[in-house]
């Protein structure tokens, strides 16, 4: 059992509601637009793809805080979980990443952590690995009460920060 599920079990011993991802957030995939490499100018705004920033461009199509999940290409980690990126500010996202925006009742940062624990190995298809929109929308999300989500995010963000600090000190 991973840490997030341990925390859910600890804080919600009677269980939590399980929802499909599409019921937990706003999915913005229809607003994505690819930009050819030749059309990109290395300027101000991050241009995101399946596994993070690919380049920089002169304009943006999103402004806010988002979770990006790889759709095709480099979409799965060695442990079988999705490639997930936290993105803030003015950004452009191509058609190789799913885009999640917060919806009332489920914290975006909670989804960021939770999605990283889901084994999607059986959902990845094709010669070029792909997590289809249909499969992505149907991912099952354990949704504890907001106060529990806040505590889980606090614990996991603290752990992430400590891990980064230790890694920096060791290198």
Where are these regions (language model features)?
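Short amphipathic alpha-helical linker/capping segments at the junctions of internal repeats
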Residues: 43, 90, 169-171
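Short, intrinsically disordered, mixed-charge
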Residues: 26, 63, 116-120, 158
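Functional cation/ligand-contacting sites centered on basic and imidazole/sulfhydryl donors
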Residues: 1-4, 24
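Amphipathic alpha-helical segments
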Residues: 1, 15-17, 137-171
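Generic structural signal for secondary-structure transition and capping sites
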Residues: 29-33, 53, 120
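Short, recurring structural edge motifs at helix starts
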Residues: 5-11, 33-35, 125-128, 138-143, ...
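A short beta-sheet element
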Residues: 49-51, 57-116, 125-127, 132
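Non-catalytic DNA-recognition/assembly elements of restriction-modification systems
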Residues: 8-32, 38-47
């Amino acid at each position: 059992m991973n840490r997030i599920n341990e925390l859910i079990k600890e804080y919600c011993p009677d269980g939590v509601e399980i929802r499909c991802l599409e019921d937990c957030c706003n999915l913005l995939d229809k607003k994505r637009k690819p930009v050819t490499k030749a059309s990109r100018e290395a300027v101000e705004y991050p241009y995101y793809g399946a596994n993070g920033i690919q380049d920089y461009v002169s304009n943006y199509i999103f402004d806010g805080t988002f979770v990006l999940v790889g759709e095709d290409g480099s979409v799965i980690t060695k442990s079988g979980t999705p490639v997930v990126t936290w993105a803030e500010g003015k950004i452009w996202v191509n058609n190789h990443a799913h885009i999640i925006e917060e919806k009332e009742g489920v914290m975006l940062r909670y989804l960021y952590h939770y999605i990283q624990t889901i084994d999607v190995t059986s959902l990845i298809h094709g010669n070029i690995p792909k997590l289809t929109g249909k499969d992505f929308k149907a991912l099952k999300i354990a949704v504890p009460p907001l106060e529990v989500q806040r505590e889980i995010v606090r614990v996991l963000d603290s752990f992430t920060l400590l891990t980064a600090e230790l890694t920096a000190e060791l290198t």
